[in-house]
Amino acid sequence: MLKNKVAIVTGGTRGIGYAVVEKFLQNGATVVLFGSRQETVTKAVASLKEKNENWEVSGAWPTLTDADAMTAEISKIKDKYGRIDILVNNAGISDSAPIEKYTADHFSKIMDLNVNAIMNGILPVVEIMKQQGGGCILNTSSMVSICGQPSGVAYPTSKYAVNGLTWSLARELGPFHIRVNAVAPGITRTDMVAALPKEMIQPLINRIPLRRMGEAEDVANAFLFLASDMASYVTGEILSVDGAMRS
């Protein structure tokens, strides 16, 4: 499905991002995964190579909030492979602090990584995709961008900004054959969720009509569909993968 495609996946060392990287590799893509630290990036790449030594996977650890660092790293990837077909903006941080615990710096930190950093990847990639005649940009949103959450206001705010960015860029970049979509996961079995107390998790599962948590692979399958030619006429969509929890 992704043979001869070159993809960048930010936040690709664990959880949903790692599952997306693996799914893309299974379907023939060449993938460069971005992570925050050299150690975790190296470990993730080695883990994937152990699964299949023929997979074309490598890693990098640019500071996502540094526009110059991102431009430089993306330029290296373009020089090495000749093109960039897919950008997955998956890196981000969550938040559950009540409003009385907030500071301006706290809010800005979350917005910086969850929104501003996305643009640091999109801007150089868009120029490359325009030159090559098209491409695909995928963003990780969240169920709470649609329904909100009772605390941690910065996180749903940042993810709603991701939705707006997705809708607007889809309209602007469509004439250049660049598709822009987002995936909005619900409660997904990741390290972060697994660390929650069981007494907190079960009530959440009870609210999901399918009566189970999502798996990282469920979300990765949505990314695969949107990245593939099966979604060649799909752009400007926020694809919910939440078991109808938000309904």
Tell what function each PLM region has.
Residues 13-15:
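Conserved glycine-rich cofactor-binding loop
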Residues 27-44:
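Conserved glycine-rich Rossmann-like NAD(P)H-binding loop of the short-chain dehydrogenase/reductase
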Residues 98-99, 103-111, 193, 204:
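Substrate-binding pocket helix/loop in short-chain dehydrogenase/reductase
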Residues 122, 158, 166:
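Active-site helix of classical SDR
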Residues 134, 212-241, 246:
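C-terminal substrate-recognition "lid" of short-chain dehydrogenase/reductases
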Residues 142:
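Residue(s) in the substrate-gating loop at a strand-loop-helix junction
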